[in-house]
Design a protein with these regions (language model features):
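C-terminal polymerase-core module
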Residues: 381-388, 392, 399-452, 639-688, ...
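Acidic beta-strand-to-loop metal/phosphate-binding motif
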Residues: 83-89, 241-249, 529
Length: 789
């Protein structure tokens, strides 16, 4: 019970009741039609106490849980007309179904028997939680719709039949059936021990085959038979007219290519990517998708439970379920894409990009293993020394010779900062931003500043050691990463990256400068790089219709190297001649040798942050300004560019009115829950950030699909607004010309268009003849522009 429920002695009063009965109203049910009770009959802890103690989920003892379980089951048995039960929240779900995790089981309808009578239990979130988190509201309504389907007689399970342990002949026959069928087919792999355990296929929504290569302890096929099956699968996945469907196909595809040398030429439909395009705010796992598009209960635990139960056949059946559910979702999503005018963008951009990201993962990037080992050894010593310096600084600052702490522990650092040294920051966070605030605070003495400086140095080196220097590479001495098309929540269209599923590699989009020498080109190759200059700010200039910015950016484009848009902004903000603005971000004092940031740097930081509703206190941190200087810069920025706030206002008004925003490229943001002020920042940033991501991503497939692109050249890295290709030096001019030509294609904004200039670099060989990421240098002349279509 909530505090308010306890006061009036009635369940679901206030906001939680409104959430629940708004959903039940669509089932033609009111309070008079339902019996309400608590799974746990007492309030374990009040909301105020829970907040004070930092308790998110109150815990009930096993003894008390068992007592309330018996009470609830007895209570239900006394309801003669009850047929359906809404189990709302983790305790209700566990008591009635025995299942843990409301996040997994929400949306499931489970048949249970209580005191000899059968019931259907519909699982969902606790309405109290939904009332506090608007993002859960759409999910809650989806789950309550299951009750509506039951009452209307529309509830229907998929009834999937899984054909497992096929003979060689049956496996080959089914692959042929799939290949020569004109219908879409789903595929899915499962892995064990870092090897492919099976490949599942389905051309029917209720029947599929798992071609499992092994049993619990033996191989199922001879070496010859398995080779023939794998070749048949390669032929199937290479068929141009085949309509292959998968959930998160990029994983299956890069795994099959790297591990099994089976290359999926082009997945026709990825349900995860389609769902991400249709409903960006929702989760996109297959478990969630199944709860949205089918009436079947949660099943994803079946992929793990077989290990405990020792029944491997359940694993193969699970594989077939994945295939059939994916096919069910694909059929429904295709209709939704067409109805919502998203199908063209989905097939012509989202799906077109995917095989190129797979290629980037499989190709990887060569590592200088000798340098990596040297850096690791040196850093291991450095980190140990830095940790000792932290102890010495803390002992001096506290005046305690025996003081000891772990600088990697936020809890122990928090005790040092706030209890022992009495430092002042914002709250009790020990993150980098708050450490900077504490360092700059007037009450922080020199000894305490030395503590912060040493902790910063230790954390920087320790992170570099664990994240970069000690990163696992593959047996072929390559770094790899998995590029995710759904990875950036607030900017769909931008790519994120992470380690690959077999455990090696790392996020290659945030590599620090001192790690870049480890990344090298293959022998006989060089790196070609381009960065889309101020792409987001240029898009903001168009969206907010800022004539002055448009003119500045165009002047910078047609006069590369001689005119700088950030200097122009600084000139306007501080009302000084353009030629008096330093062209660098930092200048060094010839007397002290200390560097300080320039007006250009501050203007650039303003443009990067203040476009998206950043407040001046945050600007103080990002631009390394005092609060007073940050407020001055904030006011100057918006005074000289009033169009920015006008753009915010019209964007928010449109979002409230239409509940959606669509970029000029065709990607959509959609508001599915009730309006929430916290969504404002992401709404403002959505169009420029998503457009930037989609534009850069499009250059990847446009280049590699161009018939002029050299056969052995490839894009190897996406670094936000930049791409890096690897090519033979003789092919460099052509590679860079194609990259520029596609990167600088005019982008249509309706009444106007814009060209975003691309700044280029090329790697230079060192004394050892090796081209490294760290040796990229600016080109003296811009690449040629070619005609593209």
């Amino acid at each position: 019970p909530t505090d308010r429920d306890c006061r009036v002695n009635q369940p679901f009063i206030g906001a939680s009741g409104q959430v629940l009965f708004d959903a039940l109203k669509k089932c033609n049910l009111s309070r008079n039609h339902v019996y309400m009770t608590y799974a746990i009959k007492r309030q374990v802890i009040s909301a105020s106490q829970a907040k004070l103690q930092g308790i998110k989920t109150p815990v009930v003892s096993k003894q008390e849980f068992d007592t309330y379980k018996n009470v609830l089951l007895t209570e239900i048995s006394y309801l003669p007309n009850c047929k359906y039960i809404l189990a709302l929240g983790s305790y209700a779900i566990k008591i009635l179904t025995g299942n843990d995790s409301v996040m997994h089981w929400r949306g499931s309808v489970i048949d249970v028997s209580i005191a000899g009578r059968d019931y259907k239990v519909i699982c969902g979130y606790n309405p109290t939680l939904v009332a506090l988190d608007p993002k859960l509201e759409i999910v809650f309504r989806m789950d309550m719709n299951k009750l509506s389907r039951i009452l209307e007689g529309k509830f229907q399970l998929a009834n999937i039949y899984a054909e497992i342990n096929p003979s060689f002949k049956d496996a080959m026959s089914y692959i042929a059936d799939v290949r020569y069928s004109s219908r879409p087919f789903a595929y899915d792999i499962e892995t064990m021990g870092n090897e492919t355990a099976c490949v599942g296929l389905a051309i029917s929504e209720n029947h599929g085959m798992c071609i499992n290569f092994r049993t619990q302890g033996t191989n199922r096929f001879s070496t010859r038979e398995e080779l023939v099956i794998r070749r048949a699968l390669q032929t199937l996945f290479s068929t141009p007219e085949g309509k292959s469907v998968a959930q998160n196909a990029n994983f299956d595809n890069y795994w099959l290519w790297y591990k099994d040398r089976i290359q999926v030429s082009q997945t026709w439909f990825d349900t995860m990517l389609a769902h991400h395009l249709l409903y960006p705010p929702l989760p996109h796992s297959l478990g969630f998708i199944v709860s949205q598009y089918t009436d079947d209960p949660y099943y994803k635990d079946e992929g793990k439970l077989w290990k405990a139960e020792g029944e491997i056949d359940d694993f193969w059946r699970y594989n077939v379920k994945d295939c059939c559910y994916t096919l069910i979702a694909q059929r429904r999503m295709l209709v939704e894409l067409e109805e919502q005018d998203l199908s063209k963008f989905f097939f012509d951009h989202v799906m077109k990009l995917q095989p190129h990201l797979t290629r980037m993962t499989v190709g990887g990037l060569l590592c200088d293993t000798q340098l990596k080992e040297t850096i690791t050894d040196e850093l291991t010593r450095t980190v140990g020394e830095a940790k000792e310096l932290c102890q010495v600084a803390a002992q001096k600052a506290t005046g305690r010779a025996d003081y000891a702490f772990n600088p990697a522990s936020p809890k122990q650092c928090g005790k040092l900062f706030f209890e022992d040294l009495k430092l002042v920051g914002r709250g009790n966070s020990t993150n980098k931003e708050n450490r900077e605030r504490m360092y700059k605070h007037s009450r922080t003495n020199s000894d305490s500043r030395a503590v912060i400086t040493n902790i910063d140095s230790y954390l920087r080196d320790a992170k570099f050691l664990s994240t970069y220097a000690s990163a696992t590479i593959d047996p072929d001495d390559r770094f790899r990463c998995e590029y995710k098309q759904t990875g950036v929540i607030n900017a769909p269209g931008r790519l994120s990256s992470s380690a690959v599923m077999w455990g090696s590699g790392l996020n290659l989009q945030n590599i620090p400068e001192r790690a870049k020498p480890m990344f090298i080109a293959d022998e006989g190759y060089e790196f070609s790089y381009f960065d889309a200059a101020q792409i987001e700010a240029r898009f903001v200039a168009m969206l907010a219709n800022i004539p002055q910015w448009k003119a500045q950016f165009e002047m910078a484009r047609v006069n590369p190297g001689s005119y700088d848009a950030h200097c122009a902004l600084a000139s306007v903000m501080w009302n000084i001649p353009y030629e008096n603005v330093p062209k660098e971000d930092f200048v060094v004092d010839p007397v002290t040798g200390l560097s300080s940031h320039t007006l250009r740097f501050t203007a650039k930081r303003c443009r990067h942050g203040l476009n998206y509703r950043m407040a001046y206190d945050r600007l103080a941190t990002t631009a390394n300004l005092s609060m007073n200087d940050a407020q001055i810069a904030y006011n100057l920025y918006h005074r000289t560019t009033p169009e920015i706030k006008d753009w915010w206002r019209t964007t928010i008004e449109r979002a409230k009115r239409d509940r959606k925003i669509t970029t000029p490229f065709g990607r959509r943001w959609i508001l599915m829950e009730r309006w929430d002020e916290d969504a404002l920042d992401s709404i403002i940033a959505f169009v420029p950030q998503s457009m930037a991501g989609d534009h850069i991503a499009s250059v990847i497939y446009k280049c590699e699909r161009d018939v002029r692109w050299p056969r052995d050249a490839r894009i190897v890295l996406n670094i936000h607004d930049a791409l890096i290709a690897i090519n033979r030096p003789a092919d460099g001019p052509l590679v860079r010309a194609l990259m520029r030509s596609y990167a600088e294609e005019p982008i249509d904004f309706g009444d106007d268009s814009i060209i975003v200039p691309a700044d280029f670099k090329v790697s230079k060989p060192g004394e050892d003849g090796i081209h490294r990421w760290s040796t990229l240098g600016k080109l003296k002349e811009r690449p040629e522009l070619l005609s593209v279509t």
